[in-house]
């Protein structure tokens, strides 16, 4: 049965009671009904993404991006010639936390993503509880014709068993807003951390294409995200990148 059907109310209350049996044991029938109404109300609110909520979320994500860039750069006060690396320094090689040889652009970008993801999780827990995912992977299910969320446990099991090839062609957006059902995606945001912040806004709006040999070669990440969104992106406005200083970039 579809979510929110005739059993939605009872199941929601039962789930709440399983999580806090002591509380439910003390509630009367009337109070239990009020709990169920509240849960149903929250579920209904997640079915849409109004402009006010979207604006608050995008502002919070932009602040997370700015915070991440500042926090990470402050870790390296004497590494670069100035407070921020120049283009040459961005291309120099270093070693990341896992012992891999990477450029400073890659290392800083990875560290900034980690900080931004933690910040986004905290902010969205308040702004849209139950209606978002951070760094969740999605894989296309050819049997159903839909994209399905891959749980962290399933992803880890595939990697540890040497079957990570099954994840080839999957998508992993930084932030997904959904209806409470992770498969029903309403909006997608990706953090982008250029090593050198450009003043050319037009350059930021260009999405890179997947390279030769990739399952989606020749397509852009935005095009694939639109497939993940399906009918929820008819306007083309539900996919954006979050860039330090610039904020939301479509």
Residue positions per predicted region:
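Short, solvent-exposed mixed-charge patches
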Residues: 1, 249-250
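Mg2+/Mn2+-dependent nuclease catalytic core
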Residues: 166-173, 178, 182-248
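Extended hydrophobic/Leu-rich segments
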Residues: 1, 27, 155-158, 239
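Nuclease catalytic cores
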Residues: 2-152
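Active-site metal-binding core of divalent-cation-utilizing nuclease and nuclease-like domains
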Residues: 127-184
């Amino acid at each position: 049965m579809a979510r929110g059907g005739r059993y939605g109310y009872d199941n929601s209350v039962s789930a709440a009671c399983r999580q806090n049996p002591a509380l439910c044991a003390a509630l009367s029938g009337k109070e239990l009904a009020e709990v169920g109404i509240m849960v149903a109300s929250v579920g209904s609110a997640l079915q849409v993404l109004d402009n006010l909520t979207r604006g608050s979320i995008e502002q919070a994500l932009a602040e997370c991006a700015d915070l991440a860039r500042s926090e990470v750069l402050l870790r390296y006060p004497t590494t670069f010639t100035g407070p921020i690396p120049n283009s040459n320094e961005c291309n120099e090689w270093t070693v990341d936390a896992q012992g891999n040889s990477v450029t400073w652009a890659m290392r800083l970008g990875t560290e900034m993503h980690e900080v931004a993801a933690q910040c986004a999780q905290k902010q969205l827990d308040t702004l849209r509880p139950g209606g978002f995912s951070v760094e969740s992977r999605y894989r296309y299910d050819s049997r159903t014709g839909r994209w399905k969320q891959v749980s962290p446990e399933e992803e880890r099991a595939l990697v540890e068993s040497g079957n990570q090839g099954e994840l080839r062609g999957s998508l992993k957006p930084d932030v997904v807003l959904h209806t409470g059902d992770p498969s029903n995606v309403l909006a997608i945001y990706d953090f982008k951390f250029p090593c050198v912040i450009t003043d050319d806004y037009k350059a930021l709006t260009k999405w890179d294409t997947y390279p030769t040999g990739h399952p989606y070669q020749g397509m852009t990440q935005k095009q694939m995200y639109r497939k993940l969104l399906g009918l929820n992106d008819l306007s083309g406005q539900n996919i954006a990148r979050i860039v330090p200083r610039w904020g939301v970039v479509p």
